[in-house]
Amino acid sequence: MAAVQQKHDWADDDELEETSTELPPPQKITNKDGSTTIIEYRLNDNGQKVKTTRRIRYITHREVVNPRVAERKSWTKFGLSVKDGAGPAPDTTSVGENIIFKPSFNWRQEAKDESKDPNAQAMKDKLKDKKVKCRICNGEHFTARCPYKDTMAPIGEAGAAADVAASAADEAAAASQGAAGAGKKGSYVPPALRGAGGAAAAGERMGGKYGERDDLATLRVTNVSEMAEEQELRDMFERFGRVTRVFLAKDRDTGLAKGFAFISFADRSDAVKACAKMDGFGFRHLILRVEFAKKAA
């Protein structure tokens, strides 16, 4: 009996076409040189198969570290960082630069050469019983190393007195010119120069009739923090009496304090109490230096 021949069904062709689009599984091959070859397949935007071959070599880097350091890295974190992973978190820890210290091999010889220098020994003997005093803030350090050398002028500096003298000379010259012009008919005379014989009238001083009293009750505060504000100084010194004026010198470019301020009281007795209490007071990690301001000549 002859075998029955099966008819070809067109639906079988569709199934074969669908199975042909399946991607082969990825392959991982270990080579003799220790590297690993990974073969992967994927479909691109046009539906075509793309074969990707990658060759990877694994290198193990071993580093000898201090066992105490390794032990600290394995400590369990606590507090707000209890859920953080291992290692330093960028939002709570800042990793600084690793500075390698390299000592000199001939440092003993350099120390001996320095000790044998006669000039250095003579200078040490000369300055043995002398105390170093800064000309800017009266601190016990050299003026060149003063932290306020770029922001404060030296106390009693000759340049400041010269500026005051120059300004007084300019005012005297202006007054003489105004008096000479007052004698001319029809010439304009400023209100400040109007008076008997063209003499300059005394202008109003800050504080009105208490101007002299204000000068005698003004304190000079040094070693002030760069982050200080005038309102903070006013709040501190108003505990001892009424404060009429607070002047905090600030840098024009950065807006930070220059390190000194002037506090004026209405009563000198209040200024005396404030000077006694606030001199040596700790403010923003610094020790304030409070003294009476020297009256300008």
UniProtKB/Swiss-Prot annotation:
The lineage of its organism: Eukaryota, Fungi, Dikarya, Ascomycota, Pezizomycotina. Residues 217-295 form the RRM domain. Component of the eukaryotic translation initiation factor 3 (eIF-3) complex. Pfam families: eIF3g, RRM_1. It comes from Neurospora crassa (strain ATCC 24698 / 74-OR23-1A / CBS 708.71 / DSM 1257 / FGSC 987). Residues 1-10 have a biased composition (Basic and acidic residues). GO terms for biological process: formation of cytoplasmic translation initiation complex. GO terms for molecular function: RNA binding; translation initiation factor activity. RNA-binding component of the eukaryotic translation initiation factor 3 (eIF-3) complex, which is involved in protein synthesis of a specialized repertoire of mRNAs and, together with other initiation factors, stimulates binding of mRNA and methionyl-tRNAi to the 40S ribosome. The eIF-3 complex specifically targets and initiates translation of a subset of mRNAs involved in cell proliferation. This subunit can bind 18S rRNA. This is Eukaryotic translation initiation factor 3 subunit G. PANTHER family: EUKARYOTIC TRANSLATION INITIATION FACTOR 3 SUBUNIT G. It is found in: Cytoplasm. CDD domains: eIF3G, RRM_eIF3G_like. Residues 1-35 are annotated as: Disordered. Its main location: cytoplasm. The gene is eif3g. Residues 11-20 have a biased composition (Acidic residues). Belongs to the eIF-3 subunit G family. Keywords: Cytoplasm, Initiation factor, Protein biosynthesis, RNA-binding.
